[in-house]
UniProtKB/Swiss-Prot annotation, chain A:
This is Protein brunelleschi. The modification Phosphothreonine is found at T329. Disruption phenotype: Failure of both actomyosin ring constriction and furrow ingression in male meiotic cells. It is found in: Cytoplasm; Golgi apparatus. PANTHER family: TRAFFICKING PROTEIN PARTICLE COMPLEX SUBUNIT 9 (PTHR21512:SF5). One of its GO terms (cellular component) is cytoplasm. Residues 314-327, 345-361, 945-954 have a biased composition (Polar residues). Keywords: Cytoplasm, Golgi apparatus, Phosphoprotein. Residues 329-340 have a biased composition (Basic and acidic residues).
Length: 1320, 138
């Protein structure tokens, strides 16, 4: 017996019998209990009506039938589309592999087509005839005529069917039952007919089962697997072991039939018995089959929900809507439910629970209700085949609980436990592995075991079974090998082993395109490779890959490269370019520089066929490939949003006014700081851009590749308002940072969102967004406000431009410059032409201001613009122009700031040959100053004779005329020894324009630009010294000026309306100018102003003495400046100007001469009124009366006046002799004190004069006010402080106090009286 | 003795991977990557009983040419060793010894105060020691 077994195995190893051609990968454990039916479409047509029929047929996968003894059976049907004939040969080994039924569906339009459909049906019957029980044909014919169709609707459907059958006839050799339907028929009865068909199959199966069960043990024949036939040739079949083998195999076959017939309990018992019998004789192959059968039967009872999985899977595959995330959720739910059921089953097995059976009964009752109608119909239809059943039997079926062993709610005792199933499968697989011909059976068993373990939520066992599949030695074709990998992939994905699934997906993909393959399927390879992305932490969105980078870069790079190869072989250039871009974007940091260069070159070559673009790529199967961008090619180091040029920068009109306020408080700064922080958080740009104006963003780029990188069509990426980007083309050198300016124009107003830039490099267009740039601290975007369009202007001037740059602030808004050279006092003008360059916007608002490096007041004198003339020209239409005239006057100080008193003090002592005017000045100064010195100086007493001789020298001729004649000749010697040379003065100024128009003006925006002015002031005329001398009449005085010509040319000087003088270059001359004296009204007004000022200053406790003098001095200065205008002209040129005397400083003595004297003189000599320049003659020894009348013309009383009369002789050589005691005698007092001279009061004094010697004498009559009584000042202050004083009294007191506080004043009778004494 | 030795971080990113045959490095990386599924599953099983958890995970899976063993530390760092299938003389005790030595080398390497956990192991000393361990002379 052992030798026989060895011989059998030896024959098996020979491999003479063909094995199953390929495994049935879709098979599951529960398919052991199904009746196998081939569902095939025949004919050329694949209309939608056939698809609907297919679905209706497939829906009938479960029926309930009553057997001959009245017990209900649960029958399942499995529909397949393809079934190799070789699988039928294994029907004895496992009966579920036997094809039992055949259903064909076809469509015909004519009799010939119908005959062809019948022929195809018959050929299929012949092919599977050895195992086929029953077959059906479903034919769809053409529709009836419209009239007949209407008639048919009224009639019964059966009649309609018959009519179609009457029209067409099947061939004579066609013996199957055919169902005819119209093309538009709803096929309402198709499902019931298929149910009848299934029932027919069941009854045939049942008869086979009963026949098998009735066989006697001693008469059974040996059942064989296809490859076992040769092994048993010549053996003694009657031996004990062979007899047991025959009985065991028959028992196993009967168990298979019982399982298919719905008798699970019987099947379990039979499997166990067969297992024991076959194991005793060492029949390993059939022992494995019994073990597999046990697992299948147990799975039927434990996991009936796996059938639902099958249904769900089919629907999912049909709809092609299944996705990995969606599949995972039901998976978890199903696993959880399975675990719960396993626990419940265990609990039920251990204890009988009364509640559990009720729940089961309820569930099964609902299931019975759902199929009750079908069962009823089936029963009615098959009445001829089964014993008669009554209606009460039908109602019993509806209410009956689970049949058989489950009536008590308990599982059979011999069922396998959940953990035992995997063990039994493992043992079965081990038994199968002993036979090479059973490799397909082994593979299918492993797959079934995997599916069971998936249901049991035991992934490690699944992994073990799947891994063992690879060890099975199968002579498979490449297509079958790929199919195996795909099935393994799917199962791995179900247990969540993404990496394993990806591994096998990659293997399947590589198998498709293996070397030596006759027809490489790159499409499948690509699809599988794409499906394996999840396992390697890849997805099609490059941004997700970058964010979730989790290592394994080498694998990712290799996978993407393989994908690129597949895409290229497919001929899909766009796809290859897209994936290569994806590779560079996601794996740039993980590649070496050499690899980076190689990939870049490859990308360049790929994109030469089809360019890459940043739009999603939709494949034919509906897959969407997201866009990939070369964000880091080139590498962006920095990106800065640039403000507009200064002269085009928008500013707020109102804000500017607010900013000009004089006070800035601290809280404003805090708010400003907070606002700044807030802006920083929002990535808000502080400045604004202007609609329709060119804007700029500066980008610093670096080329990380070792070769030149051309970048074309580089633009800004924006969001928000419409933005028109200008393309930029550049070539980046390797590893060198390059600055690029990207320009664009915002078309709308609002907020512009700058997100990055777009590039076109290496043949790929990329959107490089800031938020996707890693390793840099870029904000996600920049937000810029775009304000409405502002007009644009161009500015030109009539003066030449200058190349020098301005040192003033805000120099960046200067758009043009003008340079001008003027002599001090010269006038000129500049015409500024403003053109509105805007095409559509008028210039509606234009204001200007002038800034310079000199003081505001001086600036206003130098530059003048007529504002009204400008406003009259507004608005300026587009392309229009406006002219602005700026008048420029070279304002300067012509008066030398040297003190005149010191000048005269220095000049007077050594100058005895001066003119009479100079002499008068010396007399005035020395007369006042020499009063104290005369008393203490014996020098003057010794010089008395000289004065007398001097006075007699000038006794004849007009003194002023002589002086004027002498002056030009001695001008050079009279002036100061050295003149301070005046330097050139340089003035920088900016004429700033703020302009606006259109909507921007409404919004409160404007622009600002400036014209830079360079004004050079050359020195022209300078007054080095000045003095005030009394004139011939009392209403005038002489202003004596020393004028220097500081230019290099001859100057003609008009110092009065009628007088002219020429001054050579760098020369100076002395000029006397008669000027009217300042009127008393002005003096009164000045004093009134002084009083008002004093009232204010009382609160500040300031002294008023100096302020009054200052006021009066200013008054006289203004008086002189207003009346004296010195016009100068450079001889031979057109250059001319006016020299102003503004700023001239007058001393107190000068002020007394300038202002009109408050005293009015009336002097008579010998009863004759003395007139100016009258000849007065008297005789020696004769008494002459001298009468003097004083009148106070001022508004205030004069106090402490001293009237003095002195006679002296003037030698006209600078000497005056006052010691005339021996020549003149005065009877009566020559010094009279007047304590008080009220307003408009007159005083008269008369005395007699006797001359002892003949000669020429002069009389000096003067009135002096002395502030010697200063003790009254405190009382005056006290009086002023008294609150009880009335206003008028207070005013009067203040007048007095102010007068007392004044300095000493000397008023003289001008000119001095000249008396000629003659002999009788 | 070993084809490949890999150190995988807690986030399943490779910290160190070395092979004896450079031409097969990519293929071995694929195998190591696929083995992580089984490693994760075995780590998950031991969650319920931490006191009975063993660091050595045993044979993860085998192919025609390779056997892949796993080891996991208390800090969830995984060690993967790929051994030739034809080396039938290699016993399980020897594989355990390899992992024990590898664990010692790894702890020495991460004692470097300048090593940042989670980054690649670039220690030359560690690399040399692993090479010796791989060639069987350790």
């Amino acid at each position: 017996m052992r030798a026989a077994v060895g011989l059998m195995l030896s024959h098996g190893a020979g491999g003479m019998e063909p094995a199953l051609s390929r495994p049935d990968y879709e098979q599951s454990a529960l398919h052991h209990s199904c009746l196998l039916v081939l569902l095939r479409g025949v004919g050329p047509s694949r209309a939608r009506v056939l698809q609907r029929a297919f679905e209706k047929v497939r829906r009938v996968n479960h029926i309930r039938v009553n057997d001959s003894s009245g017990h209900p059976r649960s029958i399942w049907i499995r529909f397949v589309h393809d079934h190799p004939v070789e699988h039928n040969d294994w029907g004895d080994f496992q009966t579920h592999r036997r094809l039992l039924g055949l259903v064909t569906i076809g469509k015909f339009d004519s009799q010939i087509e119908l005959n062809e459909l019948c022929r195809q049906h018959e050929s299929l019957k012949v092919r599977y005839g050895s195992t086929l029980y029953e077959s059906r044909a479903i034919f769809f014919g053409p529709d009836e005529q419209p009239l007949e169709t209407i008639g048919e609707v009224l009639g019964p459907p059966a009649a309609g069917g018959r009519r179609l059958q009457d029209e067409f006839t099947t061939p004579s050799n066609f013996k199957a039952q055919a169902f005819f339907y119209r093309e538009q028929d709803s096929c309402a009865d198709l499902e019931s007919r298929i149910g009848d068909f299934a029932s027919a199959l069941f009854w045939v199966l049942e008869s086979r089962r009963l026949e098998r069960s009735r066989e006697k043990a001693d008469k059974v024949s040996l059942l064989l697997a296809p490859f076992e036939k040769r092994d048993f040739v010549g053996l003694d079949m009657e031996s004990r072991n062979n007899r047991k083998r025959c009985v065991g195999r028959v028992m196993k076959n009967l168990a298979d039939l019982s399982l298919q017939a719905g008798l699970v309990d019987d099947a379990l018992s039979l499997y166990h018995n067969a297992n024991e019998t076959l194991r005793s004789v060492g029949d390993s192959l059939w022992v494995g089959a019994t073990e597999e059968g046990l697992c299948a039967a147990s799975a039927m009872l434990l996991y009936p929900q796996m059938r639902e999985t099958e249904t769900l899977h089919r629907n999912s595959s049909l709809q092609e809507a299944g996705t990995s995330p969606l599949k995972n959720t039901p998976e978890k739910w199903r696993a959880s439910d399975a675990t719960k059921k396993i626990s419940a089953s265990d609990a039920t097995a251990n204890n009988v629970d009364s509640n559990q059976p009720q729940q089961r009964v309820t569930s099964n009752s609902s299931s019975c209700s759902s199929v009750s109608s079908l069962v009823t119909t089936a029963t009615n239809s098959s009445a001829s085949d089964t014993p008669t059943t009554s209606s009460s039997s039908t109602s019993t079926i509806s209410a009956a609980p689970i049949p058989g062993h489950q009536r008590n709610g308990d599982l059979p005792g011999n069922i396998l436990k959940a953990e035992e199933i995997s063990n039994y499968y493992r043992k079965a697989i081990i038994n199968y592995s002993k036979y090479r011909h059973a490799a397909t059976i082994e593979t299918e068993a492993a797959l079934k075991a995997s599916r069971i373990c998936i249901e049991q939520n035991r992934p490690l066992d699944v992994a073990m079974f799947l891994q063992n599949i690879l060890y099975i030695n199968l002579s498979m074709s490449e297509a079958e090998r790929v199919k195996r990998f795909e099935v393994i992939t799917d199962l791995y994905q179900q247990i969540g082993y993404q990496r394993k699934a990806a591994f096998f997906q990659r293997l399947a993909a590589l198998k498709h395109v293996q070397q030596g393959s006759q027809a490489p399927d790159w499409n499948q390879s690509y699809r599988l490779m794409l499906g394996s992305f999840t396992g390697y932490r890849l997805c099609l969105d490059p941004l997700e890959v970058i964010e979730n980078a989790a290592g394994w870069p080498a694998l990712q790079i290799d996978l993407v490269q393989t994908l690129i190869t597949a895409a290229r072989r497919l001929g899909h250039s766009a796809l290859a370019t897209r994936h290569m871009t994806f590779l560079l974007q996601t794996q740039w940091d993980n590649m070496s520089p050499t690899e980076q260069s190689e990939m870049a070159v490859q990308l360049q070559n790929l994109s030469a066929q089809c360019e890459g673009s940043p739009v999603p790529l939709v494949l034919e199967n509906g897959t969407v490939i997201p866009p990939a961008n070369l964000t880091d090619l080139p590498y962006c180091i920095d990106l800065q949003v640039k403000d507009l040029p200064a002269h085009l920068r928008p500013q707020r009109i109102k804000v500017a006014k607010a900013d000009s306020g004089p006070f800035l408080f601290t809280p404003i700064h805090f708010n400003s700081v907070d606002r700044r922080d807030k802006k920083k958080d929002k990535n808000k740009i502080a400045f604004q851009w202007v609609q329709n104006d060119l804007s700029e963003v500066t980008v610093r780029l670096r080329n990380p590749l070792p070769f030149e990188l051309p970048v074309t069509d580089m633009r800004l990426l924006t969001n928000g308002v419409v933005f028109e980007s200008l393309p930029q083309t550049l070539v980046l050198q390797p590893h060198v940072p390059t600055y690029v300016a990207l320009h664009g124009t915002p078309i709308e107003t609002g907020q512009l969102d700058l997100q990055g830039y777009s590039t076109h490099t290496l043949g790929v267009k990329s959107n490089c967004r800031l938020k996707h740039m890693r390793g840099r601290s870029f904000p996600p975007n920049y937000v810029v406000d775009v304000i409405p369009a502002l007009p644009r202007i161009s500015v030109k001037t009539s003066l030449p431009q200058t190349a020098t740059f301005s040192n003033m602030n805000s120099a960046d808004i200067v758009v043009t410059s003008a340079s001008l050279t003027l002599y001090n006092g010269e006038s000129s003008s500049c015409t500024i032409t403003i053109t509105n360059e805007s095409a559509t916007l008028p210039l509606e608002h234009l204001e200007f201001s002038i800034n310079s490096n000199v003081e505001q007041e001086l600036q206003q004198k130098i530059f003048r613009i007529d504002e009204e003339a400008i406003k009259a020209h507004l608005p300026v239409p587009p392309q229009g122009t406006i002219e602005i005239i700026v008048d420029v006057f070279a304002e300067a100080d012509f008066v030398c700031p040297q003190p005149p008193a010191s000048l005269h003090s220095a000049a007077a002592p050594g100058d005895y040959g001066a003119s009479s005017l100079t002499h008068y000045s010396s007399v005035s100064t020395s007369g006042h100053a020499s009063l104290p010195s005369r008393v203490g100086s014996p020098h003057h007493r010794r010089n008395e004779p000289q004065n007398s001789s001097f006075r007699s020298t000038i006794s004849g001729g007009p003194p002023s005329l002589a002086a004027l004649t002498l002056h030009p000749g001695g001008g050079g010697g009279v002036g100061p020894s050295s003149l301070g040379s005046q330097y050139n003065q340089h003035i920088e100024a900016q004429v700033r324009f703020k302009y606006s128009g259109g909507d921007a003006l409404t919004a409160g925006y404007c622009r600002q630009c400036a014209v830079s002015f360079n004004l050079e002031l050359l020195p022209s005329v300078q007054i080095t010294s000045w003095d005030v001398l009394p004139a011939e009449v009392a209403s005038q005085f002489y202003l004596v000026l020393d004028i220097s010509n500081l230019t290099a040319q001859e100057m003609s000087l008009n110092y009065t309306d009628t007088k002219n003088i020429l001054i050579e270059a760098k020369e100076s001359c002395r000029v006397p100018i008669p000027v009217d004296r300042c009127s008393l009204e002005k003096v009164v007004a000045a004093r009134a102003a002084e009083v008002a000022e004093n009232l204010e200053r009382e609160l500040c406790f300031r002294t008023q003495l100096l302020s009054f003098n200052d006021a009066l001095s200013k008054l006289c200065s203004i008086h002189i400046a207003e009346r004296v205008k010195i016009k100068w002209l450079l001889t031979g040129t057109d250059i001319q100007g006016i020299a102003s005397l503004r700023g001239i400083v007058l001393s107190q003595s000068m002020v007394d001469l300038t202002a009109v004297s408050p005293l009015e003189w009336a002097i008579s000599f010998q009863d004759t009124l003395v007139q100016p320049h009258n000849e007065i003659v008297c005789t020696v020894g004769q008494r002459s009366l001298l009468s003097i009348q004083l009148a106070n013309q001022s508004l205030q009383p004069l106090r402490n006046l001293v009237l003095s009369i002195k006679f002296y002789q003037d030698y006209l050589n600078g000497m005056e002799n006052y010691n005339l005691e021996t020549r003149v005698a005065i009877s009566g007092p020559n010094r009279i004190a007047i304590p008080l001279l009220e307003k408009q009061e007159q005083k008269e004094h008369t005395c007699s004069v006797i001359f002892f010697t003949p000669g020429r004498f002069k009389a000096s009559i003067e009135c002096t006010s002395n502030p010697q009584k200063q003790s009254e000042q405190p009382s005056s202050l006290l009086t002023r402080s008294c609150p009880a004083e009335a206003e008028s009294v207070g005013q009067s007191v203040m007048f007095s106090s102010s007068y007392d506080e004044q300095q000493a004043h000397v008023w003289k009778f001008i000119p001095p009286i000249e008396v000629t004494v003659v002999e009788q | 003795m070993a084809f490949c030795i890999a150190v995988i971080g807690k986030d399943n990113a490779p910290l160190y991977l070395t092979t004896s045959d450079m031409e097969q490095e990519l293929e071995l990386q694929y195998h190591v990557n696929a083995a992580l599924d089984v490693v994760e599953e075995k780590c998950l099983i031991g969650k319920g009983a931490p006191e009975s958890k063993e660091l050595y995970l045993g044979l993860l899976y085998s192919t025609e040419n390779h056997k892949i063993y796993g080891f996991v530390t208390n800090t969830r760092v995984k060690f993967i060793v790929v051994i030739d299938s034809s080396n039938v003389a290699l016993r399980e005790n020897e594989v355990r010894a390899i992992f024990r030595n590898l664990h010692l080398l790894y702890t020495d390497a991460i004692c470097n105060p300048f090593y940042i956990p989670g980054e690649s192991l670039t220690s030359k000393k560690f690399d040399r020691a692993v090479q010796k361990l791989m060639s069987g002379t350790a």
